[in-house]
């Protein structure tokens, strides 16, 4: 059988505590599918290795095929690695969100791009390569033929996710991931998914690009995998679904299965403000959910409508209150500087966010992902070449790039983010009375400064 080495080109300063590091779950699924069919697979994860150490591992694996994962923050690194390992006798394959959205760009440095879900496609592809067959009949790939780019018909979505083998977690550097979290947060966490796809059409999100077809794993299959994770000595899982709480019945069945088996596991998830009620939040807490994150995005209903979020700020406020009442820690994500924003809508969001009883909040600037509606609206205003879209190696809340002409300066938007965090922490640590004495004067002065900034 062919030897394939999968590469996860993550790179960041290990001293930066603001960065969440998770093993490459997608490559874990690919590896498991390949191993199930008898292929020899290795995985090289750059997360805890320097470039020389990782490159040596790749060379020592002596692969005939190299598969490199890429997303928006990894583009430069993935292209550098393609050039580094390119040899006449090595086939280079790209996969992941960014190659899926722009296969032609990656075919400048790669031989083949796997588009979308790759578990079935990679098996057919490697079988064809091994037998010297044509690539024209393989769905879900792009390649070059005599210099011409060929994009084959799309692969159908995998309907029954229970048929997929669990990710090959034995290939992950589990000890390094556990140590990283234990030293910083006193717990060890690793990702899992209960579903794929998202039926919503948020303006800025790449999920609709990959399809709106929402598919679920069975609760028993999910909890079987949680048990296997516990055997690796993790004590927490992160449900990496686009929205874990979409299907209330499915969610409650997962909670019931966890409780039925008596599992001692804490977990976290992403949610939408219109998918949480009191009973659901309480059942989640009883089943080990410790933290929930909402993509609230804006504190202005007009901007929420422009984003196609299909929620209101009142729904967001109630969702946070409901989750907190159930004993959950709550985090929220916000975007400022969106097309159509004004000084007032940004201040609405900043002041709304800082008033919510959150445990964590995160602000970012708009990120125009290729293929999204947001990208189509602003693509003529983009100021950076796509190769330079990576965040700074220091991914603190104030170091985001403004990638296009938003009508606001990057400096002004970063001031708004700083203002939001300052107001939030004053309220969090000094309470309402302290905020009235200290926070309100700061809020009024910073509002005035923000409006005056260009």
Model-derived features: positions:
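Radical SAM [4Fe-4S] cluster-binding motif and immediate context
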Residues: 22, 167-333, 351
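Short, solvent-exposed turn/loop segments enriched in Gly/Ser/Thr/Pro and often Arg
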Residues: 47, 98, 240-247, 272-273, ...
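Active-site charged/polar residues at nucleotide-handling catalytic sites that mediate phosphoryl
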Residues: 61, 232, 356
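Catalytic cores of alpha/beta
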Residues: 104-108, 280, 340-354
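C-terminal accessory regions of radical SAM enzymes
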Residues: 2-14, 142-145, 149, 329, ...
């Amino acid at each position: 059988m062919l030897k394939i080495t999968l590469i996860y080109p993550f790179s960041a300063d290990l001293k930066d505590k603001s960065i969440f590091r998770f093993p490459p779950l997608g490559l874990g699924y690919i590896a498991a599918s390949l191993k199930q069919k008898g292929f020899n697979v290795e995985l090289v994860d750059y997360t805890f290795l320097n470039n020389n150490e990782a490159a040596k591992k790749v060379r020592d694996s002596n692969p005939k095929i190299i598969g490199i994962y890429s997303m928006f923050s990894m583009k430069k690194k993935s292209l550098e690695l393609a050039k580094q390992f390119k040899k006449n006798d090595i086939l280079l394959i790209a996969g992941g969100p960014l190659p899926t959205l722009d296969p032609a760009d990656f075919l400048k440095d790669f031989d083949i791009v796997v588009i979308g879900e790759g578990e079935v496609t990679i098996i057919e592809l490697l079988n064809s390569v091994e037998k010297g067959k044509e690539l024209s009949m393989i769905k879900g790939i792009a390649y070059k033929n005599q210099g011409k780019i060929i994009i084959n018909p799309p692969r159908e979505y995998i309907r029954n996710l229970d048929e997929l083998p669990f990710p090959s977690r034995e290939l992950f550097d589990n000890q390094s991931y556990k140590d990283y979290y234990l030293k910083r947060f006193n717990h060890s966490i690793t990702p899992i998914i209960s579903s794929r796809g998202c039926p919503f059409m948020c303006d800025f999100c790449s999920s609709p690009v990959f399809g709106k077809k929402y598919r679920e794993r069975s609760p028993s299959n999910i909890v079987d995998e949680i048990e296997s994770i516990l055997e690796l000595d993790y004590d927490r899982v992160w449900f990496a679904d686009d929205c874990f709480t979409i299907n209330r019945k499915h969610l409650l069945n997962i909670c019931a299965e966890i409780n039925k088996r008596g599992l001692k596991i804490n977990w976290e998830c992403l949610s939408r403000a219109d998918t949480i009620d009191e009973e659901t939040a309480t059942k989640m807490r009883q089943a080990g959910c410790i933290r929930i994150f909402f993509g609230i995005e804006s504190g202005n209903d007009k901007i929420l409508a422009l984003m196609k979020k299909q929620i209101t700020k009142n729904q967001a406020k109630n969702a946070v209150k409901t989750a907190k009442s159930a004993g959950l820690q709550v985090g929220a994500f916000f975007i400022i500087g969106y097309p159509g924003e004004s000084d007032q809508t940004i201040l609405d969001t900043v002041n709304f966010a800082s008033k919510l009883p959150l445990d964590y909040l995160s602000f970012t600037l708009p990120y125009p992902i290729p293929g999204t509606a947001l990208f189509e609206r602003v693509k003529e205003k983009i100021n950076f070449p796509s190769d330079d879209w990576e965040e700074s190696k220091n991914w603190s809340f104030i170091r985001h790039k403004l990638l296009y002409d938003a009508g606001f300066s990057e400096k002004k938007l970063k001031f708004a983010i700083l203002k939001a965090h300052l107001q939030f922490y004053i309220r969090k640590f000094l309470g309402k009375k302290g905020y009235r004495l200290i926070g309100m004067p700061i809020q009024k002065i910073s509002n005035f400064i923000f409006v005056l900034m260009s």
